[in-house]
A protein has these predicted regions:
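Acidic, glycine-rich loop-and-strand cores that form catalytic or ligand-binding grooves
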Residues: 209-220
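Polybasic, low-complexity association/targeting segments
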Residues: 74-114, 341, 346-350
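An N-terminal structural lobe/cap that precedes and organizes the functional/catalytic core
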Residues: 105-108, 124-168, 176
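Short, glycine/acidic-enriched loop or turn micro-motifs at the edges of active sites
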Residues: 144, 172, 280
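Short, low-complexity, charge-dense intrinsically disordered segments
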Residues: 2-16
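Domain-length cofactor-binding catalytic modules of enzymes
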Residues: 107, 117-120, 132-135, 148-151, ...
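Metal-associated gating/positioning segment near the N- to mid-region
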Residues: 175-187, 192
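Charged substrate- and nucleic-acid-binding regions of tRNA-handling and nucleotidyl-transfer enzymes
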Residues: 22-89
Length: 375
């Protein structure tokens, strides 16, 4: 009996050892290169794929599969697992992209307050005016050098949208709520006002709320119809009502109405205002970076103009960006409205009026009878 048990034990041990070996398929880069794979990323991808998804196969079986993929990689591009290897093997002929030259002379543009504008901004506007799609432009007195189009620069284009001319923080804006509160109350209740400012928004890059705030912008169809936006919806939900960093702020102050015929129909007098400045948070930044890269790949420009790469509005990428940009703009507005609504509720007041205006955007307008995109 003892002898039989020993034999049984040995057999079980051998069987377990065999299973253990089979469960830990190990392939080396040398083996993979030996069957014809060239040195490069494909070797490590093949090694990882086989050892992860084919761990119950023998080395010979795994190598045979790799040989078959190597022989006809195009047959495996739709395979859920082996496509990772096949994609590294298939040589895709890249569409030839030729650099687009700038026009020798630029379109005319207005300069307001030229003596106040730095040289870098003037040079950038000269470059932008030479774009083949440029129609007209303008420089504001406070214009200064930016990326591509100067900050404070305006550019109208023909059926083309320039993601970087719109900007990274799409739809960034200022929003003002006016309350029927005597300005003296700001000093008397300073601690209270300060507490509610900090409690009802979040400052700092990447900040997110843990609780959900409902808003119709989060249910927009663009989040499901544009593949790139799908994974951004959750972050947009978490960042709704946050303020970000940099020059973004939320602050109370004094508002003085002096015009009897003001458009808000408010009596002349002094009020407390809540002013905010922020944009579309991570949603807008991701949209800007993604479509800027696409534009730079499709529209290759000279080095000094590369950030002015555009997307034609009659292309899929151009139409997608237009929809995504408008979504980001509406999201930025929703962020401000959320901040103002939370703070108004916290201080027990309802605003008499609200004013907001945005930048970092593009609009469809008419210029001398021509349809243009104004950045």
């Amino acid at each position: 009996i003892t002898k039989a048990l020993c034999v049984l034990s040995e057999n079980l041990g051998a069987l377990c050892g065999k299973n253990k070996t089979m469960n830990k398929l190990k392939l080396t880069g040398k083996q993979i290169r030996a069957i014809g794979y060239e040195e490069g990323p494909v070797v490590s991808v093949a090694m990882h794929t086989m050892c992860t998804h084919f761990k119950h196969h023998t080395e010979d079986e795994a190598l045979q599969i790799l040989k078959e993929v190597l022989a006809t990689p195009e047959n495996y591009l739709a395979d859920e697992v082996l496509s990772k290897i096949a994609e590294k093997l298939v040589v895709v002929e890249e569409e030839a992209v030729t650099e687009i030259p700038l026009n020798e002379t630029g379109v005319e543009y207005n300069i307001f307050g030229a003596k106040h504008i730095e040289e870098g901004a003037l040079l950038q506007m000269q470059t932008a005016a030479k774009l083949p799609v440029a129609v007209a432009g303008a420089l504001m007195p406070d214009a200064h050098q930016g990326y591509g189009l100067p900050i404070g620069g305006v550019l109208a284009t023909n059926n083309a949208i320039i993601p970087y001319a719109v900007g990274v923080d799409i739809g960034c804006r200022m929003c003002l709520s006016i309350f029927a509160i005597e300005p003296d109350e700001l000093k008397k209740r300073e601690a209270n006002f300060q507490r509610e400012l900090v409690a009802n928004t979040l400052f700092g890059a990447g900040r997110e709320f843990t609780e959900r705030t409902e808003h119709e912008v989060l249910d927009r169809k663009e989040f499901s119809e544009i593949i790139f936006l799908q994974p951004l919806q959750h972050k947009a939900l978490k960042q709704l009502g946050t303020s970000g960093s940099g020059n973004h702020f939320v602050e109370f102050g004094k508002v003085e109405i002096t015009d009897v015929s003001n458009t808000m129909n408010l009596p002349v007098g002094n009020y407390v205002g809540l002013l905010s400045h922020s944009g579309s948070r991570g949603l807008g930044a991701n949209i800007a970076n993604h479509y800027t890269q696409i534009a730079m790949q499709k529209t290759v420009l000279p080095k000094e103009a590369k950030h002015l790469a555009w997307l034609d509005l009659d292309t899929e990428a151009g139409m997608e960006y237009w929809l995504a940009m408008n979504l980001a703009g509406d999201y930025a507005s929703a962020c401000h409205h959320t901040i103002h609504a939370k703070i108004a509720k916290a201080i027990g007041e309802k605003p008499l009026a609200m004013v907001e205006n945005h930048h970092n955007f593009a609009w469809k307008e008419k210029l001398n009878g021509q349809d243009v995109i104004v950045h």
